[in-house]
Amino acid sequence: MFNFRSFDTLVDPNNLDETHLFDIIGKVVEIHGVQEREFQGKNVRLIEIVLEDLSGQQLSCTLWGDYVDEILVFEANIKAGPPVIILQLCRGKLFNDKVVLSTSFDTTQIHYLDTIPAIVEFKSQ
């Protein structure tokens, strides 16, 4: 169901293909405040989160548009401990000489249910 990329394969800017969509799983360790920016002549909302893999490596991820509301609802309902999410069909982008993750228009899906086998497995490790 998912085609996960490891954080190790994403952090090297020389290996970045900004056109390739992939899936990533990680623990949400930071959720920053909502921002508004002008993008292609329109005001858009965004929020940055930081994901961490099992080895402690972290990647920043920018969620755009409707994904902002989705992550805020998710954040409000966190019961205990750092949550684990799956970003399905996201992409890597080069920003300030670092690779960051980004949602891809209406294509990306955010999965966060504790019953998803990949999330259960991630949490058990």
Residue ranges and their predicted role:
Residues 1-125:
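Single-stranded nucleic acid-binding proteins centered on OB/S1-type folds
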